[in-house]
Amino acid sequence: MKGEPKVIERLNEALFLELGAVNQYWLHYRLLNDWGYTRLAKKEREESIEEMHHADKLIDRIIFLEGFPNLQTVSPLRIGQNVKEVLEADLKGEYDARASYKESREICDKLGDYVSKQLFDELLADEEGHIDFLETQLDLLAKIGEERYGQLNAAPADEAE
């Protein structure tokens, strides 16, 4: 089914963001794990995999609309050098995705592509869940300090990899 070029463009823009998020969350997972934040690292790993599933849905939709998914470029990574910077970097990426998906859903609605609009609605709901989690973690970090936050997010030695 031939899709609207503007919709395919927006789907590829979302793919650009999701592919960057996959890489950013995965690198943050590895860094956090190395720093001893094993529980938070596990969450970052899960987020990376979820973003990969988002990318897969976008690729599927682009192909269905007879477009070509652009996997050649990904959004620039924001890599934190400590736990606070990791959370802030991830939050900035989620804010960017939310803004893009809101705009994309409106374009899809105007062009009558309600299935792509629904996909953007699903992505938007997931990104807002990520935003809530990250904002909560940053609030918690500010309230209890990095040392206590580290204790909450470190697994006991016998559970660590």
Curated annotation (Swiss-Prot):
E.C. number(s) listed in UniProt:
1.16.3.1
Biological process (GO) annotations held by this record are: intracellular iron ion homeostasis; iron ion transport
State a single Gene Ontology molecular function. ferric iron binding
Q: Name one GO cellular component term.
A: cytosol
Print the keywords alphabetically.
Heme, Ion transport, Iron, Iron storage, Iron transport, Metal-binding, Oxidoreductase, Transport
Please give one Pfam family short name: Ferritin
What reaction does this enzyme carry out catalytically? 4 Fe(2+) + O2 + 4 H(+) = 4 Fe(3+) + 2 H2O; Fe(2+)(in) = Fe(2+)(out)
InterPro entries for this protein: Bacterioferritin, Ferritin-like, Ferritin-like_diiron, Ferritin-like_SF, Ferritin_DPS_dom
Report the enzyme's class at the first EC level. Answer: oxidoreductase
- The answer to keyword Metal-binding applying to this record is yes
Every copy of the Ferritin-like diiron domain together lies at: 1-145
CDD domains membership = Bacterioferritin
The note on the cofactor says: Binds 1 heme b (iron(II)-protoporphyrin IX) group per dimer.
Residues annotated as binding Fe cation 2: E51, E94, E127, H130
What does this protein need as cofactor?
Answer: heme b
The protein's assembly and partners: Homooligomer of 24 subunits, arranged as 12 dimers, that are packed together to form an approximately spherical molecule with a central cavity, in which large amounts of iron can be deposited.
Family of this protein: Belongs to the bacterioferritin family.
Q: What is this protein called?
A: Bacterioferritin
- Which taxonomic lineage does the organism of this UniProt entry have? Bacteria, Pseudomonadati, Pseudomonadota, Alphaproteobacteria, Hyphomicrobiales
